[in-house]
Amino acid sequence: MVDRVKRIQCAPALLLLALLAGCGGASAPRSMADLINPLLGPDWSAWLVGPISRLATPEETRAFLALKDDAAAAAFAESFWSKRGNGIRHAYAERAVTADRLYSEGGYLGHRTDRGVIYVLYGPPEKEGFEVSPNPRDSAIEVWSYGKDAPSGLDGNRPNPVYRFIKRGDLTVSYVPRAQPLALPPVDH
């Protein structure tokens, strides 16, 4: 009976250890909250949120999240941009200003919104349009198209041919259509 009680008392600690062990191997943060460094001041704590998170390597992301003060964050940012060159830094700054002007909404700067991230990374789309949403209660789906010959973005990758966005509350977010279920043939009984 005593062994059973000890096992029950240890269960929460073991569960916590298992969860921590499972998270330790994660290569990159999975959400906006994972990109915020709470040890830094307001000018630096969310520096990774937005397109920079797509430019940073997993090692750079981990290093930034381990910083302890704003001076270290400023030095980190300077080193980050010096590795990428002035052309990328300049293009990033110009596109971020434009994204802030065009896509700020819901209390977020434009370059930190889904449309803004794509705009900063790949520039303006070749074509913009709208599609009717499959859900009649939803707004129209905004569609951005990049040509097959679109140049690589600031992240070194070519853009996807199509990006879709839909209004959800105060924000316009990325929209990925659900796959239609396969129609199964009728079964004879």
Regions found by a protein language model. Give the residues of each.
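Residue-level signal for mature regions of secreted extracellular proteins and peptides
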Residues: 16-17
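C-terminal motif of bacterial Sec signal peptides marking the signal peptidase cleavage site
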Residues: 20-22
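Residues within mature, well-folded domains
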Residues: 24-189
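Bacterial N-terminal signal peptides that target proteins for export
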Residues: 2-13
